[in-house]
């Protein structure tokens, strides 16, 4: 029986498959960010066209005319048509940004609800961080299990990281570290911070020496966030792998229990990717297990790990959670943050490789003012008259989005939202409010960073016992 679907729909289906393969090959071939972004935008556009024509989402295993397979919302679920999210690329067609409720369903995580936030407040005796109150950290895996342990006086530790791809970090990179510092303070727990200089050497056009030097420079910015030197260990993969047999043994255990087929499915690796990329996920997984750090935890294997990170890193830890029980370790818990949008809009996250999309921690007050005024996408109207009459749209306005991250005063933020939405506040006034928040925040960070000496960095990065006793 001939296929009743129009040929154009099948052609569109095949075009999506071809474009998806192009995106994967560009990533594998270390293409430029612009090339990758352009290919991803085309992929998103094709998927939207397919949905409009077919009346349903594109599914790779379901050509037009075939019944859709049972929906799978687990780790291998098909990408939602509007949003493309993996550890290297974040792209959406919506001016409002990624649909995080859909992402929770697709990734199989749990929403951070009011009940969980209240429980964190009861457990710590501290008001929840505004990142929690405002839904910036919005999703979790097993956070209730961590709180069970904490309430029963059982230890846990924090693990987060940074991929040092450039000497200068941007303000978006601060988000997990600001929140992790708060977690360390309120729970009084050890913290390990992985600098994946090996990853950046494998993925970027860098020498080993460059990747390591970026790790050290980025460590200074991380230390400037205020972490306690007696409770924090920062390590470079290039350094620590050779120092710690416990760490390397866990890497090998993970490598043995994860197949090439699995990592291809999770990360989209192709046959042209170097073997270093294929084995790297095991290195990012290893800090999730306490005996990777015998100097801190001795040989204990039962201490649970809590990982605050942006949700694009979740594929690494879905793999980690899958392998953990098979090698005798507890699954790490996770707290996921939203993405920090680029100045040009929430369709993609801020990137250090695009100076006009980013506000760097090295920027001067003048540069910050210029970037916000010139590049920050506005939710305002075309004319002052229209804006006064109809008001602005905070859902797409980047300046307002940034204020939700960095303006701690809830009442002030709500007043700005009301004034901008009603038209009482103009776009220029909203941008001015953001500039007045960002300029001192970055200046204070720069002052703290100047106080971070090479000796302080060395102490943070030296494997050692922290101020906790693990028997």
Curated annotation (Swiss-Prot):
Question: Where's the motif 'HIGH' region?
Answer: 164-173
Q: Where in the cell is it found?
A: Cytoplasm
Domain WHEP-TRS: start-end pairs: 8-64
Record-linked SUPFAM superfamilies: Nucleotidylyl transferase, S15/NS1 RNA-binding domain
**Effect of altering residue 257 to R?**
In HMND9; uncertain significance; decreased tryptophan-tRNA ligase activity; dominant negative effect; decreased general protein synthesis; decreased cell viability; no effect on homodimerization
Question: Which residues does this entry mark as bearing N6-succinyllysine?
Answer: 154
Keyword Cytoplasm appears in the UniProt entry: yes
Phenotype upon changing residue 419 to N = In NEDMSBA; uncertain significance; when tested in a wars1-knockout zebrafish disease model is able to rescue head and eye sizes partially while the hearing phenotype was rescued completely
> Catalytic activity, per the record?
tRNA(Trp) + L-tryptophan + ATP = L-tryptophyl-tRNA(Trp) + AMP + diphosphate + H(+)
Presence of keyword ATP-binding: yes
Gene Ontology terms, cellular component aspect?
A: cytoplasm; cytosol; extracellular exosome; nucleus; protein-containing complex
The principal location of this protein is cytoplasm
Pinpoint motif 'KMSKS' region by residue range: 349-353
PTM comment, free text: Proteolytic cleavage generates 2 forms; T1-TrpRS and T2-TrpRS.
Task: List Phosphoserine occurrences by residue.
Answer: 351
Question: Which EC class heads this enzyme's classification?
Answer: ligase
Q: How does it assemble?
A: Homodimer. Interacts with an oxidized form of GAPDH. GAPDH stimulates the aminoacylation activity of isoform 2.
Describe the disease involvement stated in the record for this chain: Neuronopathy, distal hereditary motor, autosomal dominant 9: A form of distal hereditary motor neuronopathy, a heterogeneous group of neuromuscular disorders caused by selective degeneration of motor neurons in the anterior horn of the spinal cord, without sensory deficit in the posterior horn. The overall clinical picture consists of a classical distal muscular atrophy syndrome in the legs without clinical sensory loss. The disease starts with weakness and wasting of distal muscles of the anterior tibial and peroneal compartments of the legs.
Task performed by this protein: Catalyzes the attachment of tryptophan to tRNA(Trp) in a two-step reaction: tryptophan is first activated by ATP to form Trp-AMP and then transferred to the acceptor end of the tRNA(Trp).
Q: Specify the protein name.
A: Tryptophan--tRNA ligase, cytoplasmic
Q: Which organism is it from?
A: Homo sapiens (Human)
């Amino acid at each position: 029986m001939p296929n009743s679907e129009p040929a154009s729909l099948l052609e569109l289906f095949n075009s999506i498959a071809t474009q998806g393969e192009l995106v994967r090959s560009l990533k594998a071939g270390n293409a430029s960010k612009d090339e990758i972004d352009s290919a991803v935008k085309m992929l998103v556009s094709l998927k939207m066209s397919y949905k409009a024509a077919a009346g349903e989402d594109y599914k790779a295993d379901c050509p037009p005319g075939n019944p859709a397979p049972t929906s799978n919302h687990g780790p291998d679920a098909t990408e939602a048509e509007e949003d493309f999210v993996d550890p290297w690329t974040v792209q959406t067609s919506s001016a409002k940004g990624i649909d995080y409720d859909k992402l929770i369903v697709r990734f199989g995580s749990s929403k951070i609800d009011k009940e969980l936030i209240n429980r964190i407040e009861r457990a710590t005796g501290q008001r929840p961080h505004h990142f929690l109150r405002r839904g910036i950290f919005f999703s979790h895996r097993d956070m209730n299990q961590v709180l069970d342990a904490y309430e029963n006086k059982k230890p846990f530790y924090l693990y987060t990281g940074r991929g040092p791809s450039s000497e200068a970090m941007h303000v978006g990179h601060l988000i997990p570290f600001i929140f992790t510092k708060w977690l360390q303070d309120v729970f009084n727990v050890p913290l390990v911070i992985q600098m994946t200089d090996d990853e950046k050497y494998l993925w970027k056009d860098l020498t080993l020496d460059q990747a390591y030097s970026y790790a050290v420079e980025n460590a200074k910015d991380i230390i400037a966030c205020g972490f306690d030197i007696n409770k924090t260990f920062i390590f470079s993969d290039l350094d620590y792998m050779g120092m710690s047999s416990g760490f390397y043994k866990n890497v090998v255990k993970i490598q043995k229990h994860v197949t090439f087929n699995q990592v291809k499915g999770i990360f989209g690796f192709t046959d042209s990717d170097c073997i270093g990329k294929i084995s790297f996920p095991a290195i990012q997984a290893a800090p999730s297990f306490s005996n990777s750090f015998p100097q801190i935890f001795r040989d204990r294997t039962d201490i649970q790990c809590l990982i605050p990170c942006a949700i694009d890193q979740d594929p690494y830890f879905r793999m980690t959670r899958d392998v953990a029980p098979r090698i005798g370790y507890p699954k790490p818990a996770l707290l996921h943050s939203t993405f920090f949008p680029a100045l040009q809009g929430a369709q993609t996250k801020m990137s250090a490789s695009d100076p006009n999309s980013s506000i760097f921690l090295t920027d001067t007050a003048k540069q910050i003012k210029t970037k916000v005024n010139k590049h920050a996408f506005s939710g305002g109207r075309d004319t002052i008259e229209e804006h006064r009459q109809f008001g602005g749209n905070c859902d797409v306005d980047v300046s307002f989005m940034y204020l939700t991250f960095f303006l701690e005063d809830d009442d002030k933020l709500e007043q700005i939202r009301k004034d901008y939405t009603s038209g009482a506040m103009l776009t220029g006034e909203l941008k001015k409010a953001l500039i007045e928040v960002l300029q001192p925040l970055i200046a204070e960070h720069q002052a703290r960073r100047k106080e971070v000496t090479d000796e302080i960095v060395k102490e943070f990065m030296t494997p050692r016992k922290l101020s906790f006793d693990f028997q």
